[in-house]
Design a protein with these regions (language model features):
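Active-site-proximal helix/loop segments of hydrolytic enzymes
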Residues: 2-4, 13-196
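Short loop/turn segments at strand-loop or loop-helix junctions that form parts
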Residues: 8-10
Length: 196
């Protein structure tokens, strides 16, 4: 509750409708828990990356989440990967971004059958130029039959949305209030008084 979350659904080609739908599912759940949520685009419009970053930086954002799918020429490429701001060469990284990337990666893998492609530090503009902790999540490969089939179902998209919600909640929970990965449910958060 009382957190400002910016959701950035990717808008490139085939991923556009899928990640927008996932973002709307996340938005609804976050609103029900009392968070303030901003989607950076509607179903048909797509602001530029610099516009999304500027919007995020002017809205007291607590967390910036960029949602995407991936493709590859090799149809065997599959799985979920998360990215946070960091550069091993320069010895810098976003501590909160890295923690959230790890949490959402764990929750998605615990709740779905997506291959764990792990979390990675990157210096992409959307991660580097936002003032808030920022994470990009590639929720599977549309070029892979298995991932594409999963991403096409409402049940799978609901599982992804719940993974995001629980990861966000874990990010802000005290360690002693946390539960084993894959076991916490939205109803648990409500009964614990997380919702205002």
């Amino acid at each position: 509750a009382n957190k400002v979350i910016v959701l950035v659904p990717g808008s490139n080609g085939d991923e556009s409708e899928i990640v927008y739908d996932i973002a709307v599912r996340i938005e609804g759940r976050l609103l029900a828990l009392g968070a303030s949520v901003f989607l950076t685009r509607g179903a048909k419009n797509a602001p530029s990356e610099s516009e999304r970053i500027a919007f995020t930086n002017t809205n007291s954002t607590d967390l910036f989440i960029s949602l995407h799918t991936d493709t590859h020429t090799n149809p065997s490429a599959q799985g979920v990967a998360t990215y946070f701001y960091g550069s091993d060469a320069h010895g810098v990284h976003s501590v909160v971004g890295e923690r959230f990337a790890s949490l959402v990666q764990r929750e998605i893998c615990a709740r779905t059958n997506l291959l764990n492609c792990r979390s990675h530090a990157k210096t992409w503009d959307s991660l580097r130029l936002t003032k808030a902790p920022s994470v990009r999540v590639d929720c599977g490969y549309l070029s892979n039959v298995h991932d594409a089939k999963n991403l096409a179902t409402p049940e799978f998209r609901d599982a992804l949305a719940e993974a995001f919600i629980i990861a966000i909640q874990r990010l802000y929970l005290a360690a002693e209030d946390d539960a084993k990965t894959g076991t916490l449910r939205i109803s648990d958060l409500r009964s614990a008084g997380i919702r205002r």
